[in-house]
Regions:
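Glycine-rich helix-loop "coupling/hinge" segments at transmembrane-helix boundaries
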Residues: 62-63, 67, 161-188
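Transmembrane alpha-helices
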Residues: 18, 101-106, 110, 114, ...
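Periplasmic/extracellular loop-to-transmembrane helix junction in inner-membrane transport proteins
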Residues: 1-18, 33-36, 75-80, 182-188
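Membrane-interfacial helix termini and adjacent extracytoplasmic/periplasmic loops
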Residues: 58-95, 165-170
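Transmembrane alpha-helices and adjacent helix-loop boundaries
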Residues: 52-58
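Conserved small/polar residues in nucleotide/adenosyl-binding loops
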Residues: 189-195
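Transmembrane-helix boundary motif in ABC transporter permease subunits
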Residues: 15-46, 59-61, 107-117, 128-132, ...
Length: 199
C-alpha cells in the first residue's frame, strides 16, 4: 500500500472538511432563511459540481489555475508558486467539488427549524449570534454530521478532479485514488500473464 498517497488523501480530506464546513453552514443558513431575488440561480450555480462530470470540472479548474490565467498569474506573483499541480490548488478544487455535499444537508437542516422557535428566542432577548450558537447549532447537529461524513468520504475517494488539477506528483498531489489507478494495470498484468502461459 502507498502510505504516502494515503496520508496525502487523509490530509486533503481533513483540510477540506475544516475549511468547507464553516462555509457550508453560512451558505446553508443563508439559502434556507433568506428570501432574495435570484435565489434559484444561486442554488443552481452551487449545484453545478453535481451536474458536471468530474473531469470536465477539473479541466475548467485547471484552466483557471494555470499560469496563463489571471487567477493563476496573481497567485504565482503573490506566492511564487504555481496553483496548478500543487496541494493548494488541489485543496481549492476539492472544496469547490464538495460544496454541494456540504450545503444541501445543512440547508435542509436549517429549513427544519421552526420560525416560531427563533421568534420566541428573539422575544427572550437573544441576539442573532446567541440564537445561532444556543438554538440553531444544536438543532442542525444531525445535518452537520451528515455533511461532514459526506465531504470527508467524497474527498477521500476523489479521482477525476484530482487527476486533472493535481496530476500525479508523489508526496505532493498523488492521492490514494491515483495510486490505486496506477497499480491496476500492474496487478492486471500479474494476474493475466500466468493465465496466458498456462494456456
Amino acid at each position: 500500500m502507498d502510505w504516502s498517497a494515503f496520508n496525502l488523501s487523509l490530509k486533503l480530506s481533513l483540510w477540506t472538511l475544516l475549511l468547507l464546513m464553516p462555509l457550508g453552514v453560512l451558505l446553508g443558513r443563508w439559502l434556507a432563511m433568506t428570501d432574495f431575488t435570484g435565489r434559484s440561480l444561486v442554488q443552481a450555480l452551487l449545484a453545478l459540481p453535481l451536474v458536471l462530470p468530474p473531469t470536465v470540472l477539473g479541466y475548467y479548474l485547471l484552466a483557471t489555475f494555470s499560469q496563463t490565467s489571471s487567477t493563476g498569474a496573481w497567485y504565482q506573483s503573490l506566492t511564487g508558486k504555481s496553483l496548478a499541480f500543487s496541494f493548494e490548488g488541489l485543496l481549492i478544487a476539492s472544496m469547490i467539488f464538495n460544496l454541494p455535499f456540504a450545503i444541501q444537508p445543512l440547508k435542509r437542516a436549517f429549513e427544519q427549524i421552526g420560525r416560531d422557535v427563533l421568534d420566541a428566542a428573539a422575544c427572550c432577548g437573544l441576539n442573532r449570534w446567541q440564537q445561532f450558537f444556543s438554538i440553531e447549532l444544536p438543532l442542525i447537529w444531525p445535518g452537520l454530521l451528515g455533511a461532514a461524513v459526506l465531504v470527508f468520504a467524497h474527498t477521500l475517494g476523489e479521482f477525476g478532479v484530482v487527476l486533472m488539477v493535481g496530476g500525479n506528483i508523489p508526496e505532493e498531489t498523488r492521492t490514494i485514488a491515483i495510486s490505486i489507478y496506477d497499480s491496476v494495470p500492474v496487478s492486471y498484468t500479474h494476474l493475466t500473464l500466468p493465465t496466458i502461459y498456462s494456456v
